[in-house]
Amino acid sequence: MPNFKSKKIKEINLPYSKDDVEFLWLAKNDNVSLIYTKVQEESFFLQIKKAQNGFVIKGDKHTKPSKIGYLQKALKIFKEGFCEDIINEAFGLKNNALIEKTPFIVDNFDELLSKLQGKIYIEIGFGSGRHLLYQAKENPNVLILGVEIYNPALTQVAKLAKVQNVNNILLIQSDARLLLSVLKSKSVEKIFLHFPVPWDKKPHRRVIGKDFCKECARVLTQNGRFELRTDSFEYFNFTLEQFLTFPAPKFSLRKNENLEISSKYEDRWKKQEKNIYDLWVWNFNQECKNYELNEFNLSSVEFSKEDLKKIEQNFKNITIKKDDFFLHFESIYKQDENLLLKVAFGAFNKPEHCYLHLDKTIDFVFKEPFKIQENIKAINELKEILKVQFKI
C-alpha cells in the first residue's frame, strides 16, 4: 500500500483542492484521522495515523480506489500541501499510472450489472491475466468477466487489454462469492477457477464450499460448466466431493494436460515437475430463482444531538454473532458535531466493511453494500444496537 511518514502535519483547513484532487472533510478519534478524498469519479479515505516520531499517511484499506494512481496522486498532493519533514515514502506517481477512467474496470455491482449482456464467462482470481486475455481473444463474442481481490491485478490487466486491443472484458474487485450472489440465475456459460490458493492446512479459507458450489449451479446456464485447474490434489479432491452432493452432475477429470495458454504459476509448477489436475463439472439440473432484493431502510432512523453524544460516550468495540450473519462495531470518529462509524458485517464467508455517517440521519459514506439477505439482517441489527447498546 503506498504511504509516507512525516514528522509534522500543518493545520488542515478543508475543503482543499488541487490538480483534480479534493480533500472535503475530516473525521478523527484519538489515534486516527480520516480525510474524505475525491479524485475524479472515485471517493476514498486518506488515513493519518499517529506513529513514533511522526505520522503515517496512507490510503484506508477498506475504501481504497480501484486505480492505484488515484491514491498515489492524493498522497502526493497531501504531502505537498500539509506535511513537513518527510521521514520516508513508499509511493511514486508514475507517468504511466492508470489514472483515467478505463471502461474495463467497473467500480461497483450496480455498474457491473448494467453492462452484463450476451454470453458471459467468469474467471475467478485472474492474476496476471494471461488466461483471461486468451479467452477474450478466442471468444470475441463472449464477455469475459474477471473478479480479483487485488487492485494491482485489475490495473495491470486493464493496461494489457488496452495495448492488445481486447475490448470484451470487464474487471471488478470483489470476493468471488459475493459476486456470484448478485448475478442472475442461468446467466453464465463458464466459470474458471485456475490455481486458487489451496489452503490445504486451512480448508475453511478456500473459496470452494457448499454455498459456493450452489451459487455456481444457480448462475450457470443449462449446459454451463465450472472448470477448476490446480496443482493441489487435496483441493481437487475436496472440490469433487462438494459437487458430488448434487443429484446428477457430470464430470471430466484430467491430469497433466497441456492447455493452449499457461499461467506463470503453471509454468513454475511444471518446472518443479508437480502434477496438474483439471476438474470440469456440468449438468447441475438445479431449479433456481433470482433473489428478491430488499432495502436497508436507513431512513427510519433519526438522531438528536443528545443521541449522538450518547453514542459517542457509550461506544464499545463489540461483535454480535447470529446464526447466519455477524455485526462488528470497529471504530468511531468525530466529524464536527457528527459521527462516523466503521463496521464490519454480513455473512461469515462474505464479510463487508463500511463507514456510516451519523448526523440527523444515518447514511453509508460510500457505495451501499449489496443487498444480500445477510447484509440486510446485519444492518437491521445495527439499528437496534444503536438504540439499546448505546442507550439512545
From Swiss-Prot:
- Its domain of life reads Bacteria
**A single GO CC term, please?**
tRNA methyltransferase complex
Q: What class of enzyme is it?
A: transferase
Q: Which UniProt keywords apply?
A: Methyltransferase, S-adenosyl-L-methionine, Transferase, tRNA processing
Q: Which reaction does it catalyse?
A: guanosine(46) in tRNA + S-adenosyl-L-methionine = N(7)-methylguanosine(46) in tRNA + S-adenosyl-L-homocysteine
- Select a single GO molecular function from the record's annotations and give it: tRNA (guanine(46)-N7)-methyltransferase activity
- Which residues make up the binding site for S-adenosyl-L-methionine? E123, E148, D175
One Pfam family per UniProt: Methyltransf_4
Q: What is its EC number?
A: 2.1.1.33
Name the PROSITE patterns on file: SAM_MT_TRMB
Q: In which pathway does it act?
A: tRNA modification; N(7)-methylguanine-tRNA biosynthesis
Instruction: Provide the binding site for substrate.
Output: K201, D231
Q: Which family does it belong to?
A: Belongs to the class I-like SAM-binding methyltransferase superfamily. TrmB family.
Q: Which PANTHER family does the UniProt record give?
A: 3-DEOXY-D-MANNO-OCTULOSONIC-ACID TRANSFERASE/TRNA GUANINE-N 7 - -METHYLTRANSFERASE, PENTACOTRIPEPTIDE-REPEAT REGION OF PRORP DOMAIN-CONTAINING PROTEIN
Q: What does this protein do?
A: Catalyzes the formation of N(7)-methylguanine at position 46 (m7G46) in tRNA.
Q: What is this protein called?
A: tRNA (guanine-N(7)-)-methyltransferase
This protein's species is Campylobacter jejuni subsp. jejuni serotype O:23/36 (strain 81-176)
Q: What is the lineage of its organism?
A: Bacteria, Pseudomonadati, Campylobacterota, Epsilonproteobacteria, Campylobacterales
Tell me the name of the encoding gene: trmB
